[in-house]
Design a protein with these regions (language model features):
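Short, glycine-biased loop/turn motifs at secondary-structure junctions and
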Residues: 1-105, 109-113, 119-121, 127-129, ...
């Protein structure tokens, strides 16, 4: 495990190499402890893990203790419950309750209930119930039920039940068991099991409805 100074230098070199934004780089530059470094990482979670891919779950495990990661709300393995703010990556499973906010990446799994908010990237898996809100990108998979709201981007896959609401963008794929899916953008596909229809949109203007 690197010393704090070695770790700080390594992270700054990686951030500079990947053209980090000024604010994010400054947070790392001004860091006085490993806790500060983790704050810089969580404040720029999407960029660090998905855009730049400058580190991964293994890097976190190799350079921070499980206690240090947990104090920052970061989970890379095992099962955890959160009702505040959490960041999941690696093989972690997080159950989010109340008004919790979880950002998930990699192969992480999130189970969201109540008014929890989840942002899922990579190949993360999310099960959303109640009035949970999910934003899914990359190859994320979401199973939504209750009054959950999902926005699916890239190649995300969504299965919707109950009164769930889904907005499908890019090349996302939605299996709709509710009949409530009303937005398809770019190249999204919605398979409506409730009304026995398939909706396909390619580009900005062409919409095809198949009975």
């Amino acid at each position: 495990m690197k010393t704090f100074e070695e770790l700080k230098e390594d992270l700054l070199e990686r951030a500079k190499k990947h053209n980090a934004c000024q604010d994010g780089y400054r947070m790392g530059l001004n860091a006085k402890s490993k806790k500060d470094l983790l704050e810089a990482i969580t404040s720029n979670w999407f960029w660090v893990f998905r855009t730049s891919k400058m580190i991964d779950a293994n890097y976190l495990e190799d350079n921070f203790s499980e206690e240090e990661l947990s104090e920052a709300g970061i989970y890379t393995r095992k099962e955890h419950a959160s009702n505040t703010r959490a960041f999941a990556c690696g093989s972690a499973t997080v159950e989010a309750y109340g008004s919790a906010t979880v950002e998930a990446y990699g192969s992480a799994t999130v189970k969201a209930y109540d008014s929890a908010t989840v942002k899922a990237y990579g190949s993360a898996t999310v099960k959303a119930c109640g009035s949970a809100t999910v934003k899914a990108c990359g190859s994320a998979t979401v199973e939504a039920s209750g009054s959950a709201t999902v926005k699916a981007y890239d190649s995300a896959t969504v299965e919707a039940y109950g009164s769930a609401t889904v907005e499908a963008y890019d090349n996302s794929y939605v299996e709709d068991c509710t009949g409530n899916i009303n937005t398809v953008s770019d190249h999204g596909i919605v398979k409506d099991y409730y009304n026995h229809k398939i909706y396909i949109k390619k580009g900005k203007f062409e919409i095809i409805e198949i009975e």
